[in-house]
Amino acid sequence: MMNDYKNTLNLPKTKFPMKANLLISELKILECWKKNNLYSIIRENKKGKKTFFLHDGPPYANGDIHIGHAVNKILKDIIIKFKSLFGFDAPYMPGWDCHGLPIELQVEKKINQNINKINHKIFREKCRNYALDQVNKQKKEFIRLGVIGDWNNPYLTMDFHTEANILRTFKNLIKKKYLYRGIKPINWCIDCKSSLSDSEIDYNIKESNSIDVSFSACDNNKILKIFNSEKKFDKIKAIIWTTTPWTIIANRAISVNPNFIYLLVKCNKEIFIIAESLLDKTLARLNIKKSKILGSVYGKKLKFLYFKHPLNKIHVPMILNEYVDFKSGSGIVHVAPNYGEEDYIIGKKYKLNMYDPIDSNGNYLPGTFPGLDGLNIFKSEEVVLNLLKNNHSLYSKKIINHSYPHCWRHKSPTFFRATNQWFFNIDNNNLRNKTISEIKKILWIPKWGMNQIIDLLSNRPDWCISRQRVWGVPIAVFINKKNKEIHPNTVELIEKVSKKIEKKGVQAWWDINKSEILDKDSDKYKKVLDTLDVWFDSGSTYYSILIKKWNSLNKNKVDLYLEGSDQYRGWFMSSIILSIAITGGIPCKKILAHGFVVDSNGKKMSKSIGNVISPKDIINEFGADILRLWVASSDYKSDISISKEILLRTVDIYRRIRNTSRFLLSNLNDFNPEFNSINLENMLSIDQWAIIKTNNRQKKIKNAYEEYNFHKVVSNIVDFCSLDMGSFYLDIIKDRQYTNYIDSLARRSCQTAILYIIECLVRWIMPILSFTSHEIWKYIPGKREKYVFLSEWVKEIPCENINSYISKSLWKILIKIKNEINKIIEIKKLEDKIKSSLELKITLYAESFIFEELILLKKELNFAFLVSYVSIKKYENSKENAFKSKSIKNLKILAEKFDGKKCLRCWNYTNDIVNDVKYNKICNRCINNINGVEEKRKYF
């Protein structure tokens, strides 16, 4: 007599592990990819297909990658991989930005030596070696993320040929007359000891001294006459307001708005000139309660009145400037031509003395003023205030917090300083307007990105592209010693230098003897020693690398740029401007910007706050696939939240996907697609339903991928695993899979559907869960490519004309009924009335339209609802204790314990349990299945 029926069941079996062990398995998979040169295999497989090219905005080669780097690279990798699924040849060439100050600072720190105390040739070589070390370190970290790319052939802005092509980009701008050299106030960083471009400035809150300072009139009588004052007064003073006391020493004029009304005001024994609209605010700051107006005139009447400088007693003119506004101050602005953009412009207009008493370290030069010489401008404000106070010129002082420009690298305040620099004239050849027009041809994701960059471009000044650095691409130009003009053959000369740099790198410029290039003219010229802004390096990569290296891009634009939202004024801006200036068109078809990573409270990652989470820590605790899934699950178009709790929720999502995959694989252990597959029209209704559901999900997932909405991809996959599969289909098929005759049509029908589902699911997750999809791929039966990354979307099984026994509307009703039965089952379990749902029989009381449809399915409904018996009765015959459905009108459900006995094999309760010599306590259905008598099913 048989009592143990385990060996008669088709129990699930797979070597695909339940526990992921990502930390171990991912490293093995990475080794496999490396050993077999997976990237080359993919390229060979996709050769000849339509190309998709994502241009990698180069990260800076300095330090470990942070969570923002991880987000960026993972998003790019997801895109490359999903494009491959769509049949594109999508190469990925990673890049690095390798020049500039941060590397110089790290090298100085490493060798414990100041840059000016070491041979610059040796220093550049050390910078190059340091940058290469950083590239190799970051490369390993990016590869650990599961990012597949041409890691053996990345582009580096310090590659000799790239350095030469960056210089050629500069040459082309000179050729097209976009560049000029001039003295102009630009943001200067004391720590960098260099000029900064607009994109290198952050505006942060700074504490400053807000002061009112007086300038005494040189000719009181002349002023009284202008204001038509009959009384005679001396001590007439113009009041100016400023938040930069350190600039007072460089003052060379005071300005008024020609269209404002200015008042002559008597305050005690003193007479002040103040703008009418700002009188009350100014007197309040000066703590003056009583005043008398002696006269009023428009500002234009005050032109070329002279006033005494409050410190050095030189005479400075009052000039006219329409930029003086009503927003703050006294309506009179002090002008230090070398230390402000507007000051410089108005200073040039009135031919003011461009006095520059401050050096590159932000210190006052010797001979500036007694007590100030050698002091730092930001640290000596109290000295300036005391000097003004001693001269009876300081009338108010208050500490204010206001927005002020800071160096994006050092987080230190900058100051405007007029120096000789190289500028990109973005208004030449109508470039600004043309760029705004061209920007509208790019598809921006999110859409508001277009307006953001147009606003930035509309208001930006000319681009200062020169830097006073050692490690960078040189501005390889010769300047005439006398007239300061560039050599007339500059374009040809730069090409000569570029060819030398192509062989020896940027050091070639500093090694070149002038006579090598200039012949007999060499004595008349001097080399420019400035380097190019690193944003010029990276911004020119469309031309310097892609067009030069990828000939196919000569006619075709890059498909996509993808970077953080800070790159609207950075890489996006520089790339677009340079591309339009040189090629006449935009560099790419689409630009996608992602947000910053913040903690669960919305705060940015900061070491000082202590909320930094590094990619390395996440990978070491959870694995790279969890990090990738977190990125994909986030709506990255705004700021992205991360915390331990969020990552644990991501682990739950991963577990759901993995468990679903494992269940599917475990039910395919005896399935050979070539011999066991069933045609769609012969499949059971629920298997047809599963395929239709899979098709519908695939359409949604493909659309979400194409729209770059990866969080919607994840939510669709989770809903599919949890709702379509987990809470409905997979539970229902267990009885059929485990208890039916192994080669029955009903069982093979299910396996055919399962194979289709896992074939689709593994591709859905491949761009996101690259390691897990690689692992799953090995266990799917049937002939296939060696790697999931070589595959494309599963061709959907057409289901439009399927002859299904169950209509769409009936499926919706069945799912609603099942959900309500599940709730009843849970209640009965909580009340300890049952241990298993199979102990129940269900009676459905339905109105005629539902009754007629359900009655056809009656014999198999118990399999759908996971109970032992289901009966269908008319609604009017319902019992009082029947549960009234909340989701279906005129339907009641009665759940009762079934009187039958439990089958030891299928665990269903039935009245046909057999007890004989051969079989003990099992049902006739199971006996038939054991003996190969095929169980007939249509629906479930």
Swiss-Prot record:
Residue sites binding L-isoleucyl-5'-AMP per the record: 563
Residue ranges the record marks as coiled coil: none
Cofactor stoichiometry and binding remark: Binds 1 zinc ion per subunit.
InterPro entries: aa-tRNA-synth_I_CS, aa-tRNA-synth_Ia, Anticodon_Ile_BEm, Ile-tRNA-ligase, Ile-tRNA-ligase_type1, Ile-tRNA_ligase, M/V/L/I-tRNA-synth_anticd-bd, Rossmann-like_a/b/a_fold
CDD domains listed in its UniProt record: Anticodon_Ia_Ile_BEm, IleRS_core
Catalyzed reactions: tRNA(Ile) + L-isoleucine + ATP = L-isoleucyl-tRNA(Ile) + AMP + diphosphate
Gene3D superfamilies to which the protein is assigned, alphabetical: 1.10.730.20, HUPs (3.40.50.620), Valyl/Leucyl/Isoleucyl-tRNA synthetase, editing domain (3.90.740.10)
Cofactor section: Zn(2+)
Entry remark concerning the domains of this protein: IleRS has two distinct active sites: one for aminoacylation and one for editing. The misactivated valine is translocated from the active site to the editing site, which sterically excludes the correctly activated isoleucine. The single editing site contains two valyl binding pockets, one specific for each substrate (Val-AMP or Val-tRNA(Ile)).
Protein name: Isoleucine--tRNA ligase
Gene source species: Wigglesworthia glossinidia brevipalpis
